[in-house]
C-alpha cells in the first residue's frame, strides 16, 4: 500500500511538472504567429535570466509618446552562443525588432531578430514558432 501511494505521488508530480514545462515553452499559448510586428526603438534594459532573456525597449509612437515594450529572447546561453551579448548590444543601442506580438495585446512580444543600425541581423532564439537560426540555413 505504502509503495503504491509513493509511486502514485511520484507519477502525479512528474505529470504535473511536465505539463507545466510544456505550457511554459508553448509559443502559441502566449504569442500570435498571425500578428508579426516590426518595432524600432532604444534598448533600455537587459534581463539575462533563465529560461528566457528579456529586453526592454523604448518605442516612440507616431505622436512622440514613448512606451516600453518587453521582448522575449532565448536563454542567456543560447544568446551568448549566437553573439548577442551586453557588449554587442549595449543599453542605449538603437535597433529594429522583428517578432510576434503577445495574444493579450500588451506591449510584449517574442523577438525573432534584432537589426542593428549597420544592418547586422542578430537572431534571438527563443520560442517563436517556425523560427530557426538563419545562420544554419542551407
Predicted regions and their residues:
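Hydrophobic helical h-region of N-terminal Sec-dependent signal peptides
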Residues: 5-14
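Sec/Tat signal peptide C-region and signal peptidase I cleavage site
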Residues: 15-23
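Short boundary/loop segments of OB/S1/cold-shock single-stranded nucleic-acid-binding domains
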Residues: 22-37
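Conserved hydrophobic positions within beta-strands
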Residues: 41-43, 94
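Short aromatic-glycine-enriched beta-strand elements
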Residues: 49-60
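Short, structured beta-strand/loop micro-motifs enriched in basic residues and often containing a Trp
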Residues: 72-81
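Short nucleic-acid-contacting surface segments enriched for D/E, G, S/T with interspersed K/R
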Residues: 81-97
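OB-fold/S1-family single-stranded nucleic acid-binding modules
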Residues: 102-126
Amino acid at each position: 500500500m505504502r509503495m503504491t501511494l509513493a509511486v502514485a505521488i511520484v507519477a502525479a508530480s512528474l505529470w504535473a511538472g511536465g505539463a507545466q514545462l510544456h505550457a511554459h515553452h508553448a509559443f502559441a499559448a502566449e504569442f500570435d504567429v498571425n500578428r508579426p510586428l516590426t518595432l524600432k526603438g532604444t534598448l533600455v534594459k537587459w534581463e539575462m535570466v533563465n529560461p528566457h532573456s528579456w529586453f526592454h525597449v523604448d518605442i516612440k509612437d507616431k505622436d512622440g509618446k514613448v512606451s516600453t515594450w518587453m521582448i522575449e529572447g532565448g536563454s542567456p546561453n543560447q544568446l551568448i552562443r549566437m553573439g548577442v551579448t551586453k557588449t554587442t548590444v549595449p543599453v542605449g543601442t538603437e535597433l529594429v525588432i522583428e517578432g510576434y506580438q503577445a495574444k493579450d495585446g500588451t506591449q510584449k512580444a517574442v523577438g525573432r531578430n534584432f537589426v542593428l543600425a549597420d544592418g547586422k541581423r542578430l537572431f534571438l532564439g527563443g520560442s517563436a514558432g517556425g523560427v530557426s537560426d538563419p545562420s544554419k540555413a542551407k
